[in-house]
């Protein structure tokens, strides 16, 4: 009798409308219940209600009150956690197809169907890409997904690569070529094949895009400086602006350097053969002449030319470094001309390093961690590799060449793709000032430092560099790591702007056009200026894509590395191996540390640091943990740790600090 009673329906609606409504994000637990995290409060979600939602869903909920207890009742979906996602295939006891989401906080199986476009016969554990089709809060149906793409079999040793690339929607294949290739750039080129250019790179490198030649500048038989000639491969000589290769390069933006192999931005026959500055092969190049005095100051405007060059030798970083460091049984140059080039480049590099330490910024050296892999992708070892003198020779030549390109593009083209960094985020300038004063000021220098580290001064390139030079000699990384959190991100811009991170007025890369799309764009601009041809300012969508691609590539590299670290360290738990580590982050939940030996990232739960969580306080300004009122751990601290758990399924490594 009450079934269709409009008064009753109205009453129910009024009761519902009178209840408090909130918006928040669902957080699951390892139990059946969960929580709704709102701006100022967290609400309990009971197990039956958790079946309607998923960890990470943004939802609307009503608050049900029973006595003094409150709990959230999910009402509607604002934004689902899952749309496109990575998953593993499973079959339930009735042999029904399901997927398990590859996410540490989502463990409920989701029913699934296989799209017709997926031809593989799916097996338990296969990796796939799926899309969520129905959601209980949105569609009044249970969770259901469609499998749209097969990635690889469960037992595929290269799963870390294929799964990660699929997650970030990146291709595992090089760009398809367009043979035969024709030289489109028919304008006259200078013939510089007689100059004794050399390339210095890793032994395994195929895509060599730079070669160097140097000679002293003398007046009245006395050396007064250096003439450095930087030759850069010229792929735009073969790639038309309206070609498919150009469009693909514009989308990829970078060659993706992954543990074990790379995925080139250009077709391999261009990057590794036709454009690569292979020894004793004549290649088209864009060349820059740079003159400096003996102290490394640039003394003339850079001179760019289109040319043909011929590298006379491919040299390996480690061999050149061994030779210059006079290591036992070191490699020796095959020809006196090569030895002469190495020694001159070495002298030039020492001058430029000193110039940068004085006039710009030079970073404390940190190692690169390299995975040594077997054919099947198994990690054999992880090496911490420091930049040696041969690496610095190439680095200094590229940096000065990029400084010159920024100057040339700014003056001649009035545009380009410039690498910029504006230092401290404006909203954190006050924090940076306060932090520096708290850590460096005393009674004697208080007034001087208040001016030196004023907000106005820190916002300028000179003031920022001055501050960096002040903290450079300090042994600990604490100041550097803490200040880093106040910085903005580096940006690509189409007009000249400073690069605070390098301490330079302008910086525009053009030295890796085989590997970076921004460098291809700058090549085209430089060549257009030289040929007096029209050109266009780089579009904002190109700059935005470069920014996004750089971010994606870093995530891909990090995700693969995290997976490989888990595989490598899994059997080290039982042996109780001890490692030195640097504290990288400090949170209420614990510490994030990096093993110095191999670069792996570990989580140290706060519960293992002290048995009474009420006595642990986080100081977010200092990025430090206080235990019983004493500052016990801060970022930059070196601690001794051991591994306690490695979970490959969630790519997480847990450890504890050894007291």
Curated annotation (Swiss-Prot):
UniProt keyword annotations, A-Z = Cytoplasm, Exonuclease, Hydrolase, Nuclease, RNA-binding
Quote the Pfam families the UniProt record gives: OB_RNB (PF08206), RNB (PF00773), S1 (PF00575)
Please tell me where this protein is predominantly located.
cytoplasm
Q: List each copy of the S1 motif domain by range.
A: 576-658
Q: Residues in domain RNB?
A: 189-531
The EC code for this enzyme is 3.1.13.1
Coiled coil where?
none
Any one GO molecular function term: exoribonuclease II activity
Please list the GO biological process terms of this entry: mRNA catabolic process
- Which top-level group of life is the source organism from? Bacteria
Question: Single GO cellular component annotation?
Answer: cytosol
Q: Where in the cell is it found?
A: Cytoplasm
Q: What PROSITE patterns does its record include?
A: RIBONUCLEASE_II, S1
Per its record, the protein catalyses: Exonucleolytic cleavage in the 3'- to 5'-direction to yield nucleoside 5'-phosphates
Similarity field: Belongs to the RNR ribonuclease family. RNase II subfamily.
Instruction: Quote the NCBIfam families the UniProt record gives.
Output: 3_prime_RNase (TIGR00358), PRK05054.1 (NF003455), RNase_B (TIGR02062)
Summarize the protein's role. Involved in mRNA degradation. Hydrolyzes single-stranded polyribonucleotides processively in the 3' to 5' direction.
Protein name listed in UniProt: Exoribonuclease 2
Q: Origin organism of this chain? A: Haemophilus influenzae (strain PittGG)
Quote the gene name from the UniProt entry: rnb
